[in-house]
């Protein structure tokens, strides 16, 4: 198949969606598909040599307008092309397939409020979001994606995301596909996991019976590090 991917930036070293897209491109190319990438920037060295790149130039714009600029530029660039299928990730619309790696923005915004312990603060923050141009712009774009005239095939990454589509946009589970995010099995080797576990515990003077949690990431408040630490405190002293 001749497949077009649309995503503003594909720099796999940054992680997240960009890493997943690169992995998916490699797998599809290995299976013999012709991949086209419509993007503003990319790391060609991290992608198969068979990929055909299409530069999508964007003028400067405020943050809340950038997704609109890229989405519009992609649709313009795709005109006249003869791809079998076009695939968009996150903030694009009007394509054959939408595969939102970050789930729904509406759900994310609501869940973000839970990082505030005080219910009153949550209400205040939610109220001020009604005046946030970026917030309102992203909500409007999301409604265009899933409730607009062009009906795309929507792929959810989990049951939770599928439920969010039903809750926020009344999109039936029957109208969605479910494809869970899969890790490249060649990226991490598990054969020496126990050996590494022993070595690092010895280096850090951690007893083999001690319960240990490893957090790797940014924005620890949003990712839930604080509740994890509180949970560790509540564990029985001799817990396995």
Where are these predicted regions, by residue range?
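Nucleotide-sugar donor-binding and catalytic loop/hinge architecture
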Residues: 1, 192-212, 236-238
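Short hydrophobic "strand-cap" motifs at the C-terminus of beta-strands
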Residues: 6-8, 157, 179-182, 215-217
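Short His-centered aromatic/hydrophobic patch
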Residues: 88-93, 100-102
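Conserved donor-binding/catalytic core segment of Leloir-type glycosyltransferases
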Residues: 155, 207-223, 229-232
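An amphipathic, basic-hydrophobic alpha-helix
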Residues: 60-86, 94-95, 136-144
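N-terminal strand-loop element at the rim of the active site
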Residues: 7-14, 27-65, 77, 175
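Nucleotide-sugar-dependent glycosyltransferase donor-binding/catalytic pocket residues
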Residues: 13, 184, 218-222, 234-237
């Amino acid at each position: 198949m001749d497949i077009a991917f649309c995503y503003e930036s594909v720099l796999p070293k940054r992680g997240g969606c960009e890493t997943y897209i690169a992995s998916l491109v490699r797998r599809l190319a290995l299976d013999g598909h012709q991949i086209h990438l419509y993007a503003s920037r990319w790391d060609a060295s991290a992608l198969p040599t068979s990929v055909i790149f299409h530069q999508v130039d964007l003028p400067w714009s405020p943050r809340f307008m950038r997704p609109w600029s890229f989405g519009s530029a992609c649709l313009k660039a795709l005109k006249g092309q003869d791809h079998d299928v076009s695939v968009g990730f996150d903030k694009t619309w009007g394509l054959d397939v939408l595969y939102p790696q970050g789930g729904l923005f509406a759900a994310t915004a609501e869940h973000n409020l839970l990082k505030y312990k005080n219910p009153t603060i949550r209400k205040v923050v939610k109220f001020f979001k009604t005046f946030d141009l970026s917030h309102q712009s992203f909500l409007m774009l999301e409604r265009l994606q899933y409730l607009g005239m062009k009906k795309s095939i929507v792929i959810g990454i989990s049951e939770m995301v599928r439920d969010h589509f039903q809750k926020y946009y009344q999109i039936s589970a029957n109208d969605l596909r479910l494809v869970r995010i899969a890790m490249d099995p060649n990226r991490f080797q598990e054969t020496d996991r126990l050996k590494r576990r022993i070595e690092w515990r010895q280096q850090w003077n951690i007893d083999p019976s001690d319960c240990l949690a490893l957090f790797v990431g940014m924005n620890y408040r949003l990712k839930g590090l604080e509740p994890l630490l509180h949970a560790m405190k509540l564990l029985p002293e001799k817990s396995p």
